[in-house]
Amino acid sequence: LHLYYGKKAEGCMDYLLTYYDRGFSGNPYDAGTDRTYSMDSLPQELSCYGNGDFRSASLMLENGDGSMSCDMRYKNYTIRDGKYSLPGLPAVYADNDEAQTLEIVLEDPATGVEAMLLYGVLPELDIITRSVYVRNQSSEKIYVNKVMSAELDFLYGDYDLLTFYGRHAMERNLQRVPVAHGSQMIGSVRGTSSHQYNPMMILAEKDTTEDNGGCYAMSFVYSGNFQGEVLKDQYNQTRMLLGVQEECFRYPLEAGETFYAPEVILSYTDQGMNRLSQNLHSCIRHHICRGKYKTEVRPVLVNSWEAAYFDFTGETLYNLAKEAKSLGIDMLVLDDGWFGKRDDDNSGLGDWYVNEKKLGETLGGLVKRVNDLGVKFGIWIEPEMISEDSDLYR
C-alpha cells in the first residue's frame, strides 16, 4: 500500500491510512471477515488489473492460460547506495553519495510472475525516480498488456491538473483544469511523444501559484508512445499514472525474460510551480544530460532555412556566415536543399549527394571558407525520409 508523498515529515505517518467498510467494494479472500480492506479503495504503489481494484490499473498481464488477473504481493526489499540503471533505456544517473535506490519485489503467488518497483531517491534535489520491471518466473509465455512506470494515489485533496498541449509550430501550451470524477488522459500513439502533448503532468492544489502552494510533477524519461492519466474515484480519491501507451501494447515475455519500463521523474514542492520547475531543471541538467555540453555553453547558431529556404548558393551562405560572425553567432547550419534535386519539398529526399551545381562549389570548400571565418559549420539531414520524386525511390 501507498502511505504518503509530499512535504518532509517527522515520525510515523500510519495514521493517514484509514480503513472503512465501503459497501460493495470487494475484499480479498485473505482478509476474511475484515470488510475494511478493499483494493478498490486503498492507495497502492502498483495497482493490478483483475484483483478487485476497478480503477485504472498500473499493471495488466495476460497469463499463459489466457486469464487476465494479476495479484502482486510483497516479497522482499533492498536499499542500496547509488542510483539504479535501466538496460537499453535513458535514466537519471548519480554518484553513490548522491542517491539511494529502493527495490521492492512483488510476486503473484498464483503464477510466480514478479514485478520489481524501483525508486531512485535524490534528496538534495527533491527528486524521486520510479520504474518497474516485470520478470516472467512462470513456466509459460505471458504478455504485458499494460505497465505504468509510476503511480501516485491520494486519499485526500482537491487538485487541478496541468498539462501541455500543442501542434506544429505551437508546442507546449499550458492547460489547467480541475480534476473531476472519472478519468482525464493525455498521450501519444504517433511513435514519438510528439508535439501534441508533453509526456508530463502536474497536480496542483487549488491555490498554487508560481511562487506558493503544493504541487506534484511526473515527467517521463522516454520519447516514444506514452499515456498519462489522472482519475478521481467515487470516494473523491485521486490516482495519477504515467507510462507507456497501452493502446496496441502487448509485449510477449517467455519464461525467464524481463521487461523494463521507462523511467518517470517525480518531484514535490510546497513553494509553487517555479520551484517545481527548478527541481526538474536541476535533475535534467546534472543527472540526465551528458557529454561536453553538460557544463559548457552551447553554441549559438543561425540556420539557413528561414533565411533562404531552398534558394541559396555557396556565396549567399558564406555571406550569411559573415553576418553571423559580426553578431557573435558561433555556427552556421546548412538546412534543407543542399542535396539531389531539392528545390522544393516534393522531391529529392533520399538523394544524399551534394548538389555542387547549386552551391557553385564543393561542400568541403564551403565548409573551409566558413570555418576560416571562425564560424562552425553544421548540416541538416533527415535519413528516415524519402520522396517519390527521387533517384533512390525510382
Predicted regions and their residues:
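Short loop/turn motifs at secondary-structure junctions
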Residues: I128, Y143, Y260, L327-G328, ...
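Glycine-rich, histidine-containing beta strand-loop boundary motifs that form or position
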Residues: V132, N145-M148, E263, D336, ...
